[in-house]
Amino acid sequence: MKIGVMNNPAKSVYEETIAFGKAGYDFVDLTIEGPQARDVDTAKMEPILKRYNLALTGHTDPCLPWAYPVPGIRQACLDELERCARIFSALGAGIMNIHPCYFCPPAMRALLVELNIEALKPIVEMASSYGLTIALENFKPPFDRVSTFKTLLKKVAGLSLHLDFGHANMGQNNHAIFCKQLGTAITHVHFSDNRATADHHMPLGVGNIDWKNAVATLKATGYDGTITLEVFCDDSQMRFQYLDLSRKYLLELWQ
């Protein structure tokens, strides 16, 4: 099991990565989004990763309307995702996250899952050409339940599941149901706490997620991959203290 942290896109991606390396994390969950992380100079980033022996996973902008049913919009989003894929691949990533697309005309709302399936196929194919596996993240309805993901995984060959435990705490199906029914499809994980009313991104143990059960259920699937501590705080010093407490708690529970 590897524990990593996501960069804050409002700060320098290079300074963030150096800070993660100095703090002893295993990998960077590199999100490519504005305002400060819209582009990444791989020639500048690669030696930083090597210096601190950091691996990397890819995280994409959650606001891209990649399944919107207008060909030009889909193509523009595919081009942007391919730009991200080139960066992730060059930096040694094997996983590339994508968020469900909720953008569609109101009269087509009932077709939202089908629109996502249709648009995911070329995205997964593109990512595969760069040696990347696309991991779709669970989030708001209807992408908050196992039944939707079973359909997606069946109809989109090569797709995998990015299980966000904080999101699952707010959704129709919690982490236990996802792990028990789709455990073998999980390729990446996000851990953060909340009180089920919003995506608070709290340190582990602060909200109402049962972390003993969460870790035990995840381990029972045989998962031993990357876990991102997605804990947010405006104060950088406090953020790393919260992250360190969360890491220690996770390591204790994982034993």
Where are these regions (language model features)?
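Histidine-acidic metal/acid-base catalytic patches
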Residues: 1-2, 9-21, 143-162, 168-255
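N-terminal pre-domain/capping segments
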Residues: 1-89, 247-255
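Hydrophobic faces of well-ordered beta-strands that scaffold small-molecule active sites
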Residues: 3-7, 28-30, 56-60, 96-98, ...
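A generic structural signal for short
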Residues: 4-6, 33-34, 72-73, 111-112, ...
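Acidic (Asp/Glu)-rich catalytic clusters
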Residues: 17-23, 39-58, 83-92, 125-129, ...
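Short histidine/acidic/glycine/proline-rich micro-motifs that form metal-
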Residues: 32-36, 63-65, 102-103, 139-141, ...
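Active-site acidic/histidine proton-transfer and metal-coordination neighborhood
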Residues: 51, 67-160, 170, 240-241
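Conserved radical SAM core fold
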Residues: 62-66, 102-105, 193-199
